[in-house]
Every structure is written in structure tokens, then in C-alpha cells.
């Protein structure tokens, strides 16, 4: 639902550093997935991790011709913990002495028969609902408070790993509240940062140093009225799994749209592309981005639903929150018919057989320009699409005011952005392509060289 132009509201989003216990588990799951993909690009994988104190559990299902061995899994787990920056059990977890327990089973034959069907089609590995969202309020296509919260956690991680703030430790979180008027962000009303630090550092130094870093990261969005909360409890020395247990998939809201859009509930990390709660969520994001970047909407949320063993979605819907330049139902038909949402097609288009996933577990699954699903991957409506329309013009026989396919009422060119003047037989005519199936209507009243 669109906000009223004068309505004031506050939207809050959060982000975690790489050393947060839940993010630690996400990175373990995706590091193992990446390692499996290097071994076997066709692996079917669902790996989760849990962490508490100085112990890590790895469990799940894998179907592969060349699965990782136990000692390889243990070494990858230790490497992830070490790369994040943990050094001892006293500060969170020790990469060299932590206990690693592994329980990996083959994928259920009942599930496998729906994924790899007898007819050779790759089916969805489960039923499920996924969502993709995009907005024009930031270059990343993400809500501003989420982008700002991510700036804070990335600034913390950079300051720690470069040694700029030597007493910072890996665990941390940030939260940013932004006031909107209508759909336009105005200012940061509050921000919260909780950063793990060494015991010998005084809280006053922690607060002043982190506040300066945060203000620089947030820039002009911070005002004199912004409420600031840095390590509100006064001490954050014990962190990581020693302070809080971690589990794969518990930060899917922060990793996607910050609560501004829906989430189907399925975790991403540790899952290969046959699992549509990951692959289709990425495809839905790609579709939403295209709608926004094509200026069909200022905001868009795509919903896709699947049935286990079936390759095509059972439902596709679109919500543009009142910002669409054409009805949402028509955009949904366009998405369903123009974008191949079968698992095999999504895996190929989004490059989901390549080892790119641990990066998403560290930095979030959307908003990074180098990720395949952040690319539009659709034809330019003014070039290739129109060429196909022109080529098919001679076969069209629609009555004025209707498309021959019967899908939709005729729309104005300002909505379709695909109307052009083409030669049509012996006459000139304006042709409008149905955005659903590309059938063509030739205006009966057009004259050569003129407009309908």
C-alpha cells in the first residue's frame, strides 16, 4: 500500500557484522556449499550450522558424486572462524580448539525424485513462497535505513581488519531509524551501534570513537536531532557464540530488505540453486529491480509460489504499492511470461553453479552490483523488443482498441513504452505490443507516415 504524500513515518532496519554468531553460521554453511560446488557443480546441498560457546555443529543433506570428507569440512569450518577474526574462546570462539561436530546425510530419495524427474526436468525441491523487492530511493535499490545500517557494520569491520581501531573485535550490530514523508526519506532520527571491544578499553573511548565513525558513514542524513546509542549496556567484551548461540538462516530479514518487504521464511545460506527459496528469491529480486529501473514502478514486490517437484511456479503476483505506471495484474502477467522461473533456467541465468555464496553470507544477498541477480538481463524495450514486434506485424489482425490475444485493454504509449511507428503492409500504422504475449494491434485509422 502506498504512503500518503504528507504522511510521516519512521522505518528502522538493522545489520550485523561478519562476527555475529548467526552470520558466522551463515558463512560456514555457504563456505561449505562453495567448496562442494567447486568439487561438483551439480551438487544438491542443504547444509546448516549452529554455534554455541566453543562448539560448532554442521548438519544437513548433500547429494554429490564427490562430497566433502569429514576432515575437509572441519578444516573449512576452522578457516571461516579464523578469517572472521576470532582468536580465542574467551572472546567468542577459538578456531584451533573449537569442537566441530558433523552430521551430513544423503538427500532424501523422496525429495530427489521431485528434483531430478524421470522426464529430465529439474523440479522445485520444495513448496514455498518467495519475495523480491526493489525501490528507487537508493542506487542499490534497497530501503535507505537498511543501506545505512549496512554502511555502519561494514565500517566497523573495515576499521577492525585494517587496524584503524585495533581494540575492535568481530561481533557487532547496527540499527538505523529513518523518518519518511510519504515515500521520501528525510533524516536519520536514531542510530544504534553495539561493537565488541577488548576489555582494557574504557567505555568513553569506545563511544566517542564509534560515534565518530558512525557519523562519517551516515553523512548528512544525521542531524542535530538524531538520537545516538553506542554500546548502550556499557560493556561488550564477551561476544560471538560464547555470548549468544548462532544458527544458519536467522538473519534473512537483515540480509534482504530489512523488514520493509515480505520474506517467505526460507533461509538462503547452505542451499544450492535447486532450492527455490534461494534461487527464486534471487530471480524475484532481479524482476523487481527491472521494474524499478525501467520506471514501471517506484517500488515493486514480486511474489512467487512453487510446488515440490513442479518446475513452473504455481503463482506470480506483483505489488507496486500504488506507484506502477500500469496495473499490477498486467505487470504480473508480464513477469510470469517474460521471465523464465523454472529452477534450471534460474540456475543458469543467475550462475548458481558457481562458488559465489560465502560472499552473500558476509555482506547480504542483495544490493551488490557484481552479483548476477542484480543485473537486469532483459531486452531493451526500445530496441530488440520492438524489432520483434515489427517483424511480426504482418501476421497481426486485431480489432482497434483490443489486442488480438484478448489479454488486456489497449494502454497508452506512456504506459507501455513500446509504441513505435512501423511500416505495416502498404500503409503506415502505429503498433502497440501486448506486454504479456507480444501480440500486436495495428490501429485501423492510421495513415502512412501518420499517428493513430
Where do the model's predicted regions map?
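Periodic, rod-like helical contexts
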Residues: 408, 420, 424, 431-441
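Conserved phosphate/anionic-ligand binding catalytic regions in large, soluble enzymes, centered on
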Residues: 16, 20-25, 123-138, 237-261, ...
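Internal helix-turn-beta structural module
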Residues: 299, 303-390, 449
Amino acid at each position: 500500500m502506498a504512503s500518503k504524500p504528507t504522511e510521516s513515518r519512521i522505518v528502522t532496519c538493522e545489520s550485523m557484522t561478519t562476527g555475529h554468531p548467526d552470520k558466522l553460521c551463515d558463512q560456514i554453511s555457504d563456505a561449505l556449499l562453495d567448496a562442494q560446488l567447486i568439487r561438483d557443480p551439480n551438487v544438491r546441498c542443504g547444509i546448516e550450522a549452529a554455534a554455541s560457546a566453543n562448539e560448532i555443529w554442521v548438519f544437513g543433506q548433500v547429494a554429490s558424486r564427490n562430497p566433502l570428507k569429514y576432515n575437509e569440512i572441519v578444516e573449512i569450518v576452522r578457516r571461516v572462524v579464523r578469517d572472521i577474526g576470532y582468536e580465542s574462546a574467551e572472546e567468542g570462539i577459538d578456531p584451533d580448539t573449537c569442537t566441530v561436530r558433523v552430521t551430513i546425510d544423503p538427500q532424501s530419495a523422496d525429495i530427489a525424485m521431485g528434483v531430478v524427474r524421470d522426464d529430465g526436468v529439474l523440479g522445485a525441491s520444495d513448496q514455498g513462497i518467495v519475495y523480491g523487492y526493489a525501490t528507487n530511493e537508493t542506487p542499490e535499490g534497497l530501503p535507505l535505513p537498511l543501506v545505512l545500517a549496512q554502511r555502519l557494520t561494514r565500517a566497523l569491520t573495515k576499521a577492525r581488519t585494517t587496524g584503524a581501531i585495533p581494540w575492535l573485535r568481530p561481533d557487532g550490530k547496527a540499527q538505523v531509524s529513518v523518518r519518511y514523508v510519504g515515500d521520501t526519506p528525510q533524516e536519520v532520527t536514531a542510530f544504534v551501534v553495539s561493537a565488541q571491544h577488548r576489555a582494557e578499553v574504557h567505555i568513553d573511548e569506545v563511544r566517542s570513537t564509534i560515534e565518530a565513525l558512525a557519523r562519517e558513514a551516515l553523512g548528512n542524513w544525521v542531524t542535530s536531532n538524531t538520537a545516538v546509542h553506542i554500546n548502550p549496556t556499557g560493556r561488550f567484551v564477551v561476544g560471538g557464540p560464547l555470548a549468544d548461540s548462532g544458527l544458519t538462516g536467522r538473519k534473512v530479514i537483515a540480509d534482504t530488505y530489512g523488514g520493509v518487504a515480505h520474506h517467505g521464511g526460507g533461509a538462503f545460506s547452505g542451499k544450492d540453486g535447486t532450492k527455490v527459496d534461494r534461487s527464486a528469491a534471487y530471480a524475484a529480486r532481479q524482476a523487481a529491480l527491472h521494474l524499478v529501473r525501467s520506471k514501471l514502478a517506484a517500488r515493486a514486490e514480486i511474489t512467487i509460489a512453487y510446488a515440490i517437484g513442479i518446475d513452473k511456479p504455481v503463482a506470480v503476483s506483483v505489488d507496486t504499492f500504488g506507484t506502477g505506471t500500469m496495473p499490477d495484474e498486467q505487470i504480473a502477467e508480464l513477469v510470469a511470461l517474460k521471465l523464465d522461473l523454472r529452477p534450471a533456467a534460474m540456475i543458469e541465468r543467475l550462475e548458481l553453479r558457481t562458488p559465489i555464496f560465502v560472499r552473500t553470507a558476509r555482506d547480504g544477498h542483495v544490493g551488490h552490483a557484481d552479483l548476477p541477480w542484480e543485473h537486469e538481463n532483459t531486452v531493451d524495450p526500445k530496441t530488440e523488443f520492438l524489432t520483434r514486434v515489427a517483424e511480426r506485424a504482418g501476421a497481426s489482425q486485431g480489432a482497434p482498441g483490443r489486442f488480438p490475444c484478448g489479454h488486456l485493454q489497449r494502454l497508452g504509449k506512456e504506459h507501455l513504452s513500446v509504441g513505435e511507428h512501423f511500416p505495416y503492409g502498404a500503409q503506415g500504422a502505429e503498433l502497440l505490443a501486448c506486454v504479456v504475449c507480444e501480440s500486436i494491434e495495428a490501429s485501423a485509422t492510421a495513415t502512412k507516415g501518420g499517428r493513430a
